[in-house]
Structure formats: C-alpha cells, structure tokens
UniProtKB/Swiss-Prot annotation:
Signal peptide limits: 1-29
Family per record: Belongs to the 2S seed storage albumins family.
Protein name: 2S albumin seed storage protein PINP1
Glycosylated residues (UniProt): N138
Gene3D superfamilies named in the record: Plant lipid-transfer and hydrophobic proteins
Biased composition (Basic and acidic residues): 120-137
GO molecular function annotations of the record: nutrient reservoir activity
C-alpha cells in the first residue's frame, strides 16, 4: 500500500513537512538578518571614513578657535559611534600633512634636527591639536553622545628624534 495509507502516518508526514518548512523559513530569515548586518557594517565603515571630515581636518591644521559650520555639518551627518574614530583619523592625516610640509623646509638641516630644535613647541602644538580633536563634538554642539572623544596619542617626534 501507499506511504499515506493510515491517518497516523499521514499526520507524521505533514508534521515532518511543516517542521522542515518552518526550519527552512527560519534559516532564510536568519540569512537576511546576517546580510542586513553586513550591509550595516559596510555602511558604518563608510560613515567612519575620515575623508568625510575634510573641513574638520582644515580646522585641526589651521588651529582656528572654532570649527567651521561645514565641519560641524560633516560631523553631524556621521554615525555617532564612528565620530571619534573618524576624528582621530582626520587628526592623524592633518599631522601627516604638517610633517610632510616640514620636510620641504629650506634650512638644509635634517628633518629630525629641525624637529628637535622646535622640540617643546612642536609637542605643545600636537597636544593642542589632540585637545581640539577631543572637544570637536562639543564645539559643534552635537546633541548625541559622544560629546567628547578620548584620543590617546604618543608623540612621533620624541620617538623619531631619540638619538644623534
């Protein structure tokens, strides 16, 4: 006779089919969540891009008293959980720019000697830049946290200029 000859075996097959169907449906829903999660991560990665803070890098480089309106708008559009990381990267880029302009100096001395001559002044400039970067969300009057970033820095200049 057939597989579905008794009502009990028909019920078992229907139950098994329903269980497999629900398991398959759950797996598809789970996959969608993971894919959505990947998309969120990708979007978050893009929103953490320090290139989106070009006006803020200008603020960090030029040491203005207040960031420009454009800088604050760029920061406002950025995802709150990415702001400090992007600000730190923008600070790194602005300091890389500053040190590359050092190498173009015409005084003929090697770069690390020029840095050592400026020594304390350069360290203070770097500390002030870090403070400006840490306070940037607050200076832009952003409502969401974080309103202050914790940026830990090690001076590149003390490492570079260690020996003669």
């Amino acid at each position: 006779m057939g597989v579905f000859s008794s009502p009990m075996s028909t019920l078992r097959w229907v139950t098994l089919f329903a269980a497999l169907l629900s398991l398959l449906e759950w797996g598809t829903a789970h996959e969608d969540i993971v894919m959505d999660g990947d998309q969120v991560v990708q979007q978050q990665g893009r929103s953490c891009d320090p290139q989106r803070l070009s006006a803020c890098r200008d603020y960090l480089q030029r040491r203005r008293e207040q960031p420009s309106e454009r800088c604050c708008e760029e920061l406002q559009r950025m995802s709150p959980h990415c702001r400090c990381r992007a600000i730190e990267r923008a600070l790194d880029q602005s300091q890389s720019y500053d040190s590359s302009t050092d190498s173009d100096s015409q005084d003929g001395a090697p770069l690390n000697q020029r840095r050592r001559r400026r020594g304390e002044g350069r360290g203070r400039e770097e500390e002030e830049a870090v403070e400006r970067a840490e306070e940037l969300p607050n200076r832009c009057n952003l409502r969401e946290s974080p309103r202050r970033c914790d940026i830990r820095r090690h001076s590149r200049y003390s490492i570079i200029g260690g020996s003669d």
